[in-house]
Each structure stands twice: as C-alpha cells, then as structure tokens.
Amino acid sequence: MTGWNQLRLQRPLAAWACWSRVLRDNPNDSAAKQALEALLKAPHLPHAARAVYRFRMPSIPIRRARWNAVLLARDQEDLDAAADVFAQLMAADPEDADAAFNHALCLAWLGHNADALAALDRVVRLDAATRPDQAAAAWVVAEVLRQGAGAERFADEWSHTLVMPRHSRDDLWIAQLEEAGRLRRFATPLRPDTLEPVATDLQVYELLDRALTEVGEPTSGYGDPDSTPPPPPSRPARVMCSVLVQPNELRFSSPDPESLRRVETFLPMLRPDASCRPVQRLSSPLPLNMLDAAAWLTRLPVGLPEDQRRRLAQEALDDYYRNTWIHQPRQGLEGLTPALAAESSDPVIRVRLDAILTFREQVDARSPVGWPLEIHHDFDDLRRRLQARRPDATPRLDQPHLKTQATPPELDRSEPQ
C-alpha cells in the first residue's frame, strides 16, 4: 500500500514508514521526499501525527544483553521481521516495556493500528507507576492510532449522520429556514485533483440554532422545541448540523451527538411526515485534521468589531473544554470522563489523562480547518482543573528517515531513555 493510501486511511505513521522505506532504498526519490516533507509540515495535523518516532533502548544490562543476542540473529531491514523480534523479546521478558513500545511502533508503521494499541496499553500498564513520562508519551501515540482505519472500534472522536429520503416538499422548509437565517448555504466542495465540484446536484448547508444576523438587526427563529426568546444579536449562534441535500436523500451530520438528537426532534416540526420516513443512522471516526470539530461549532454575528469577535470566540472555546469536553466519556480513559479520571488514584488512568491532554493541546495548537481566528485554549488551566501534569517526553519532528534497525553496536552506544 502506498503512503498516500495510508494517509487517506488516517494512518500517518504507516504513511511515514512507506515513504521512509522508499528513501532508504532510493535516497534521491523526489516524490517520496516531497510527500514526507508535506507530512512533516502538515499544518492541520497534530504534532504526534507527523512526528518521527525512534526505538527505545533498554536501560537494564541483562536486557541489553538479551536484546543483542536476539537482534544479532535476525534481519532488521524488514518491519515484519522487526515486529517478530520485539514480540520474541516481550515473550522472554513480559516486564520489558521498551520491547513492547518498539513492537507497537513496528505495528503502527505497518498500519496495524488495533494491534499497536494493544501493545501501547501494555507499555502504559508497565511504565505508569515508575516511568510516567515514557508511559504518557506512549499513550499520545495511541491517541493518534485510535482514529485510523482498522481501529475504528477504539475511536473517541466521531461524526454522526442521519440519512433520510428526500421529498419534493422538503424544498419548502429548506427555503423557509434559509430565509429566516437559520440555514446557511455554502459552495459545493471541489475535487482536489480537477477542482471541479464533487457533484452538480449537491447543496451544502449549515443549520444554526438561531439566525446569524448583522449586529443591530433583530434575530429570527423557526419553531425549535428548545427555542427561547430572541437573544441579543451579539450572542453567537451554534451549528446544529451540516445538511447535504441530494436529489434522493437528505444527510444531517454533526460531531456532537446531542445536537443531532435535537435535529431529529426538530425535523417533524418542519415536515410532519419526517417521523414516518425511514432514517439511517451512521457514525464514522473523525479524520485527524478535524478531531476538535465539536469545539468549533460557534458562529459569530456579522459586523462585530474584531476584538469582540475574538472575545466571543475565545469564550465559546473555553466553555467547550471546561463544561462539555471534560464530561464526555473516552475509551482512552477506559470509559471514564476526564473529570472522573481526575479523581482516580490509578496511575494508569492518571498517565492516560496526562497523555490525552497533551494530545488535545496539540490538536488545539494546529490551524483549525475553516476557522478565521487564531485562538487557542489554555490547557495548563485545564490541567490545573483536572490536577493533571504535563509530561516531559515529546516526539521529534526533525528526523527524515526510518530507523528499523537496532543492531547490537547501536544498542551499546545508545543512552537509555
């Protein structure tokens, strides 16, 4: 499988390994060089998704001797062979967290995300109490892998969709909502290769919880079961869902399942027969460049001064993390919410919380897709609220080639990590 295919499957570590192997065999391959450079500099990916990872080296002499004996007898040029070597070392010493981490890296480079997650879980359980920084660094990698193809059942960030048949009478409520300012239309997305619309019969909208008006204009709404008196025009609107209108179907999508439930309650008020139509419910992991999509559902009134726009956007972002995100259960925390994980005395849970905050900070630090303001949440404040710590270990972005070899001389020269 090519690097680009791996990247489309949300497996950036496997994509990096593909291109790095090409460069190992042919250092002058310009296509691989450009692809690798594009990945390492991708502005919309979190740091951990484009970092370069290295094998860990054992710090205990008896383990170093065991590693040297096993590595001397095996070919390390092949990732499958390298994975087998570290599996053998793990079998010989079940407490060897470094072998487990290296095994996880090999599996991740091969695109076996689910198996790599299991190996990283083992690393965290071995290292949490005695080497929390190394354990947290391992779990940051796990946060990348859980969103990739093959590990869907472990994902924590999802896009939820309702699909229902379209009737010709739907045009009426679509027009009414658009006129009321509750439904905003966008240009049809373009194909990246041809720059042509992905479809000529596709209409793309955002459904807002209130009208997005000019400052100073009255707001208007349209029968919502949760409707309230018209808010001040400076109050932001919130996206309930995106709406794709196609000739034969309607698709309502949101990263926020609660918003989508409101939409499902809202639809029968627009079209009484909506509750009688067959509804298909779909969910898929969010891509790595949109993991915080639920944090960016605020839409600001038109015509606000720049300082007021920035203040309102910052308040909405901070409110999301402080009052919504921390109360959402996560598989990465064994089903706990960050708020409940903060109360745990289990070192494994504590390390995972540290890692998830580190990864989420990286997600927040990159350029959000389609958002005009450069604002970020203060994750140190969130750490204080959750009594979490900032791990010292961070992956590097400056290494251009894959290191699948760990020969005995290298091990002897390497400093323990």
Question: PLM ranges: what are they?
Answer:
Residues 1, 35, 64-68, 102, ...:
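"A position-specific structural signal for the A-helix of alpha-solenoid helical repeats
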Residues 31-32, 99, 133:
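TPR alpha-solenoid repeat register
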Residues 143-234:
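Short Lys/Arg-enriched alpha/beta "domain-start" segment
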